[in-house]
Amino acid sequence: MTENKKLQIKEFFLLDKSEKEFWLTKIGESDWRAGKYLFKILSEGSFNQQYGEKSKVFLLTQGNNLISFCSFSERDEIPDTELTPWIGFVYTFPAFRGKRRIGKLIEYIYRLAKNQGFKQLYISTDQKGLYDNFGFSFLQTMTERWGGETLVYQMEIVHKDYSDIIGKTVRGTIDRPLGASHPRHKEMIYPINYGYVDGLFAGDGAEQDVYVFGTNQPLKTYEGKIIGVYHRLNDVEDKWIVALDDRPYSDQEILEAISFQEQYFMGELYR
């Protein structure tokens, strides 16, 4: 079943010929005018000429399904601007909307931009307020190449320091033990213990949330060491990663374990 297959991010220009042909056909099936245009310039081989030699196109896939796509480019539809880089051609197929899947591509591009030393990411849109949900804020109205007005949003690329937190021992309460269901979304089952630090309040005004590693049994309370912080890019709260043991958990292991909930948010793990 498709739902049981993992989401994957693919870089279009790194695919082999047959894969490119397959996914290009999927892009062409979008019901969006700009998606059709992307299909055209990818088919013609003129994408990089228009948007920059280092520009890329990313696909979010699940099995043989194309969930979302977007570009990460040096230039966008606005001429004579020094703003760079841009996220563009942002699209999610109708059958997969409602779960903020495009956020996974934006999160991935955010990390790329951060690793390349950029301080901001930009996006041009006619959708007022849409990208506020993905960590962007309105910058200004600009004129695009065809003469119309477009709304430009920017996302600050942040570098957090959690050195004063990571390594500390904390204790608290488990209010959603392993095997429990989410109080509002009953289909979400907690594969690990989830709780909070007693008496310590986070940015959302509630007690600081924690994911607790190191046991396969449901808990009521815990005491362990903070081994990481998951910083949400489009929310006001961080999630602390707490271990009950001294096992060296990998980043991938942590991210996979918390993805049942964090897949609906954008974020990055600090160790």
Feature map (PLM): residue ranges:
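Hydrophobic N-terminal alpha-helices or hydrophobic patches in metabolic proteins across all domains
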Residues: H159-R271
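Short amphipathic alpha-helix that is part of the acyltransferase structural core
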Residues: T2-S46, V57
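Short loop/turn motifs at secondary-structure junctions and domain boundaries
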Residues: N48-E53
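Conserved beta-strand in the GNAT
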Residues: V57-L59, N65-R75, W86, Y91
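Conserved acetyl-CoA-binding loop-helix of GNAT-fold acetyltransferases
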Residues: T92, G98-R111
